Amino acid sequence: MSSVSEVNVDIKDFLMSINLEQYLLHFHESGFTTVKDCAAINDSLLQKIGISPTGHRRRILKQLQIILSKMQDIPIYANVHKTKKNDDPSKDYHVPSSDQNICIELSNSGSVQTSSPPQLETVRKNLEDSDASVERSQYPQSDDKLSPPKRDFPTAEEPHLNLGSLNDSLFGSDNIKIESLITKKTVDHTVEEQQTEKVKLITENLSKLPNADSECLSFVGCSTSGTNSGNGTNGLLEGSPPSPFFKFQGEMIVNDLYVPSSPILAPVRSRSKLVSRPSRSFLLRHRPVPEIPGSTKGVSGSYFRERRNVATSTEKSVAWQNSNEENSSSIFPYGETFLFQRLENSKKRSIKNEFLTQGEALKGEAATATNSFIIKSSIYDNRKEKISEDKVEDIWIPREDKNNFLIDTASESEYSTVEECFQSLRRKNSKASKSRTQKALILDSVNRHSYPLSSTSGNADSSAVSSQAISPYACFYGASAKKVKSGWLDKLSPQGKRMFQKRWVKFDGLSISYYNNEKEMYSKGIIPLSAISTVRVQGDNKFEVVTTQRTFVFRVEKEEERNDWISILLNALKSQSLTSQSQAVVTPEKCGYLELRGYKAKIFTVLSGNSVWLCKNEQDFKSGLGITIIPMNVANVKQVDRTVKQSFEIITPYRSFSFTAETEKEKQDWIEAVQQSIAETLSDYEVAEKIWFNESNRSCADCKAPDPDWASINLCVVICKKCAGQHRSLGPKDSKVRSLKMDASIWSNELIELFIVIGNKRANDFWAGNLQKDEELHMDSPVEKRKNFITQKYKEGKFRKTLLASLTKEELNKALCAAVVKPDVLETMALLFSGADVMCATGDPVHSTPYLLAKKAGQSLQMEFLYHNKFSDFPQHDIHSEGVLSQESSQSTFLCDFLYQAPSAASKLSSEKKLLEETNKKWCVLEGGFLSYYENDKSTTPNGTININEVICLAIHKEDFYLNTGPIFIFEIYLPSERVFLFGAETSQAQRKWTEAIAKHFVPLFAENLTEADYDLIGQLFYKDCHALDQWRKGWFAMDKSSLHFCLQMQEVQGDRMHLRRLQELTISTMVQNGEKLDVLLLVEKGRTLYIHGHTKLDFTVWHTAIEKAAGTDGNALQDQQLSKNDVPIIVNSCIAFVTQYGLGCKYIYQKNGDPLHISELLESFKKDARSFKLRAGKHQLEDVTAVLKSFLSDIDDALLTKELYPYWISALDTQDDKERIKKYGAFIRSLPGVNRATLAAIIEHLYRVQKCSEINHMNAHNLALVFSSCLFQTKGQTSEEVNVIEDLINNYVEIFEVKEDQVKQMDIENSFITKWKDTQVSQAGDLLIEVYVERKEPDCSIIIRISPVMEAEELTNDILAIKNIIPTKGDIWATFEVIENEELERPLHYKENVLEQVLRWSSLAEPGSAYLVVKRFLTADTIKHCSDRSTLGSIKEGILKIKEEPSKILSGNKFQDRYFVLRDGFLFLYKDVKSSKHDKMFSLSSMKFYRGVKKKMKPPTSWGLTAYSEKHHWHLCCDSSRTQTEWMTSIFIAQHEYDIWPPAGKERKRSITKNPKIGGLPLIPIQHEGNATLARKNIESARAELERLRLSEKCDKESVDSSLKERASMVAHCLEHKDDKLRNRPRKHRSFNCLEDTEPEAPLGQPKGHKGLKTLRKTEDRNSKATLDSDHKLPSRVIEELNVVLQRSRTLPKELQDEQILK
């Protein structure tokens, strides 16, 4: 075939020839229609057009390289000579000489084409001319193309391939051996056009051997020979039969070269029916010794083995051999092999099962490149026998690439044939470029060349060649082995101090690599020979290896050793220069910079072919310099769970390489690329290609996916990877899944032939004979559907043919015994999978099983099928009697199978790990209500027996546990004797089968509906309910996900259930019964109460754990949350209730942000157990609770309003009529799921309530909609349409949800009660008396003032200044300061800071009585202004301060230490020193308080300090001067409040809203009625006792005082709401207030006036001692005591005044 015709092949035919026709559309879309168009295609271009699998790209590039190479050179042809056995054993055999050799090749249509190469060297001058002519075929001839003749070849539909009949059909009565040897020569195009030659086929007929089973066909190829006197092309075979085989017809030519030298040999060969040929020893003794070629190089056999292992599609030629003769290589007229194998190795080679077709015979890559459909039905044997290395292969070799072949290993000089030389060339050139080792790609390696003998003397033309005579015993001598050398050398380091370092250096003929020691497998550096410019001597026993990038300097101990190294390297360079070729350019699959553990800088990593190269940088890679190579054939890749998420490891037996990518995507790309390379390295396409010979095997038997590469070897179906995963779930007994590409050892010749004979089409005729069109499985079907389909198809036999259903078991067995002795395997398969017993009795005492019958009959395929189904047990199936069978099976259950069984656990459950370790496989039998387990299936005595009627609980574990043998599916059996039996099945189906059978035995009939549920737990419990709380009864319960099904005795209802996520209460308690403690579980759901307890502690623990888990939160879906009785998640109900109680009067409540840490803690608490978690005022902040509600609504799996309805909600806004729009909203809400509908109603009701109080909280419907629109719709941003929808829902809540009028009125009443405390009377009732000092703490400078719960520091400051009649000047700034710790620490309060909240926090101080407030001038105001002005310019405060921590966490020791501080962006950073780049600590200024000063007990080194307070830690800082202290304090103050440090200029001064801030006016707190004297007296005594305790311990009760202000205010409000109007409006003032109002600040302490007032008060109390007041009219004493603890401090006030304050 001409090269032009090959490259013009249509791309479709080309892709079909390599089994990649699925990419036809990709090529057409990219403009590639013929092979010629693909001349410039490369790997990256293939990726761009959409071919992603690396193996497919390699295959395409490989075949394109082979075809396109013929555009540059004309192919080299070969002469083939064979001998034929004549009827007359004494007849001479001879081979005539041929001036021209004819090569037979495949054309596009599958025909054979001949070409006439130039005349080659004459073999012998005087050879007899043969008068015999080629027997001509009757096929027509067309265009000089030769097609193989037709032959009836068994197709996939035929039941069996009979080797004997096949032999006859191919070659008539004689077995024919055809061997070919193709010798390649370079040919001139002009000579080729001028010469034509007749084709003569020389064959060799062998008579039948005695044992046919030990023989195989070896159809290797056709050899051509002829004379000049032929008739041109008339002798060509004609026609285009479809079969790949053709029957050779022609007369054999005898060559006297092979006439036996002794007449004694003839009879021997006649008896053995062998071709007579000289012995090997004779040939060796008489061979001429030719001249040794000057520059030839040998090829080692190890390389051939490596190529054979790596090749993805093997096409081997197997020579016909005789088992009675030693395995000698064929002797050809143009060459001879002198590398013989040992006799014993030859005898080991078995050719019993080899069945070769033309696909094995024509070994030319041209046959693959063109569209010849080569039927690859040859079966190869994977037994561990050595394959001969004299296999002959054909190749087209371009002239410029003749020498460009890579040799991986060096060997000693050897003899070889010319043909073996070309065999090595073929293997080198035909291998895909990506299959070469990357080392050879990057290195411009020294190539080992094999030259034909005709070219050893130079570049001779064809005429010169033809004039030379070639000896029939010409030998090829391989070149001497490459010099390799290794040893210890000193290498000069390239960087740093440039010191010599000892390295183990190796030179392997291709590159220099150096290691830390001789045991390491991975080098520290590689210097390829191609990168070396020269090697030169340097003084002191040193030599240099010079490359373009750098010069490597090595030093040795002796000069002789240095000279040896230099000599070896220079010789290698010289050899390279003589044979150098252009470097192969291959685009790497993946390259880039990665971090490699152990290296500081990033490493340039390259993945190409089956290796990963590590280089220092990209330039080194381009130059060929590298660090090391990681071969993929021994590697594995996995992700690494470290702090760096982008890490992965390549693991080899010798070392693990840990890489880190920059992004997660890059890491995944690398892992995927490496995994693909590993898979391609280990894959072998040979088995797949042979099995795909049957066209039906090219699509998955289950889902029709193309090119399936997995198979179930016992079911005889070829399946895809997705279906293979589901086949494994059936268990190895029902489906044995194996890979076509990687499980090579399992694929024997018989097994491959079995798959070819049956095929997916014929297999599906049985398995899917009743499959309907709508029940078919598709490629993209989900996993669950795929699993169900495969289970129904193979396990249940739902779709299989039922033609044999009428047969009984005995009849099926008889039919099976009759079928196995015939070649029809399909019949055997149908019988076996229809219920026949594979181990049934045959009636033959010797051949007692069907397998032995098949062996007796010599049916190897039947034997193979029965062998892989020896454990199969497919039940007899009848669709029509299915109901009857199931009914009978329910009444009498019998099961037997191997199960994993663990020893029974007594008194308590063993650990899971221990149970799994003690698990052993047992033969289990369930029969007659007893479960017995045996040591094995042959044992007669059981190891144990379980009475199923005694079972009280059966637990099923849906998760699979893993043993060394694989996953197992566990179920547990509990007995009243506190024994637990654990069993494990290999599949989930087997687990369900056993548990259903066991449950039917111990669950009574009235509760059998429980067994219909998909339960995880089923059994018997004792219960009590509201119908009978006096005694315990027995009931049957089953757990199904989150539902508890139960059937209770004494109830007419057959069954009921509890929704466990709706439980209002789930608690466990202990009671005593009959002297024993009993654990009882209480379940309350919507008014139904159920008490349960178990028979034993073990089974109760199982039930309690399962119920508690099912009742908890399971996922982020709304329906998976713990629900209230109204189907509203408990977390939503709790947040709504808390905000309603404490937040209706809070301004902008839903627009405030909470603390992220507190929010996450609350969410986690609710998720853990929302039912038992309670929100508490004081402990949980309002802002955190509102944020939790918004976060929950935003994070659920689907939006509350559902994303599916989103367009409908938005489109409703187009309706202008309000009533119509409201109707649409109602319709949308009714279409929501039940939980969504109930939750939405609760949310909108709450928002409606909040907006009703918008005058107080400023949260109208629009503001609420702005907040909640993104939460309810779960959109990233806010749109006006979403806001309008939510606003509509809030405003029209009553109409949309059809709320009744009385419910609306009730809501208004509740709102009024909740918000009433915000009125003037309520607000004043919550005021407290506080002593505030002016400028200094002196008795005459104090003022007792009323502090309201909402008073800010600015109000307090202005009120004090007004009382004192102080008018600040223009430059003065007054502020309120907080002074604590005995006046050692003070800080200014921000003008917006709440005063009362700060005062209440004093309770946490060590000495709360020493704290007070003082109003004075802000002396550092000028400094603050100055700092503020400088700060606007972007300055950052920094400096060295001395710090001490309390308690010590960061700092070591208990002394002040120098640290470097930086104040920036609202944070204070602490560094170890000025040079540190990473901070040790970061302080958030917003969460801390900074005081001026340091406590003396800290022993500060200076008197200028600052103290920082957080919730749990204190930090003490010391400055070196007062100015530094002031600068730091002011800078921190400014940073804390973001420059908003005083009220804006020109703004009206803010004053208190009360009538008179000084004592007087309305009551400060509720006054006790005179009639309640007894209670008041008790309160006074209690307060005095508390005061005494305070004075003794100087500590207050932190827990009671730490309550929030709003909780106390709400209590005060509650008291006032129920107070009688008459009493509340009484204008009379308490005498104590009159006393206080008249008291001047200057009055001396201890004045008798106070005593008089106190006496008057006591008289009034005595006078009204009998009067009583309703409890709702008094303030709880607890509140008085708590507030009093804060107010009572060590201050000098009259005792009478203190008593009066206590009373208040």
Curated annotation (Swiss-Prot):
It comes from Homo sapiens (Human). Residues 6-70 form the SAM domain. Residues 126-161, 1636-1675 are annotated as: Disordered. This is Arf-GAP with Rho-GAP domain, ANK repeat and PH domain-containing protein 2. Pfam families: ArfGap (PF01412), PH (PF00169), RA (PF00788), RhoGAP (PF00620), SAM_1 (PF00536). The modification Phosphoserine is found at residue 1632. SMART domains: ArfGap (SM00105), PH (SM00233), RhoGAP (SM00324), SAM (SM00454). Phosphatidylinositol 3,4,5-trisphosphate-dependent GTPase-activating protein that modulates actin cytoskeleton remodeling by regulating ARF and RHO family members. Is activated by phosphatidylinositol 3,4,5-trisphosphate (PtdIns(3,4,5)P3) binding. Can be activated by phosphatidylinositol 3,4-bisphosphate (PtdIns(3,4,5)P2) binding, albeit with lower efficiency.
